[in-house]
Amino acid sequence: MSEITKRAFASSLKKMLAKKPLEKIRIIDITEYCGVNRQTFYYHFKDIYDLLEWVYTNEATKALGGKKTYETWQQGFKQIFQYIVNNKEFVLTTFNSVSREYLERYLYNEVYLLLIGVVEEKAKGIPVREKDKSFIADFYKYAFVGIVLDWIKSGMKEESDKIIERLNKLIYGNMEEALERYRTDKTYSYKK
C-alpha cells in the first residue's frame, strides 16, 4: 500500500509539473489530486523536494536496468537518455527550476554506478587502489553528466545514439590505459 501511495504522489507531481513550475506546487495540491490528507503525504515524505528525489531515485533508477558492464554500458547510458526523453516535461521543468540539483544528483549517481561497474570489470587482475578506481569513474562521470546536461539545455535535439557513439570513440581503450597508469605494482613514467 505504501508503494502505491508513493507512486500516486509521484504521478501527481509529474502531471502538475507539466502545467506549472515546482515552486508553485503545494503539498495540498498533490494531496487533493490524490484524494488523501496532508498527513498521508508527510507519512511518506518530508516535503515536495523529498518526493522529487524519490521520483528520481526510484522510478528513474529502473532506467539503468543492470547495464553496468563494459559490454553493456552503452545500453545503460541509452536507457538514461530514454528515461529523460520519456519524461521530457518532468525533466525540463526540474532542470529549469531551483530543484535542478535533484536531477543532477540523480544523473551523477546513476552514471557513477554504471561507470564504476565498468572500471571494476576492467580492473580485474590489475592491482589498483579502490580510491584510484573511484577517481577514474568520477572523471568519466563528470564528463558524461556534463554532456547530458548540455543535451538537455539545448532541447535534446541531437539523437542520443550519436552522442553515445561519439562517447564510445573517446572511452574505447582509455579506461584500460588509465588503470594501467594507476597500477600499484609498477611505476608509470609520463612522456614529455
Task: Give residue spans per PLM region.
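Secondary-structure edge/capping motif, primarily at the C-terminal ends of alpha-helices
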Residues: K67, V91-F95, K122-G125, W151-G155, ...
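C-terminal peripheral helix-coil segments that are non-catalytic and often amphipathic
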Residues: D150-K192
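Cytosolic nucleotide-binding catalytic cores of signal-transduction proteins
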Residues: K19-K20, P127-V128, Y172
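Amphipathic alpha-helical packing segments from all-alpha helical-bundle domains
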Residues: R100-G125, K131-G146, E176
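Helical hydrophobic small-molecule/effector-binding pocket
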Residues: T72-E120
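Amphipathic, non-transmembrane alpha-helical scaffold segments
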Residues: S2, K6, Y56, E104-Y108, ...
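A short secondary-structure junction motif
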Residues: V55-K62, N87, V91, L114-K122, ...
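An amphipathic alpha-helix adjacent to DNA-recognition modules
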Residues: E3-K6, A10-K14, A18, E23-I27, ...
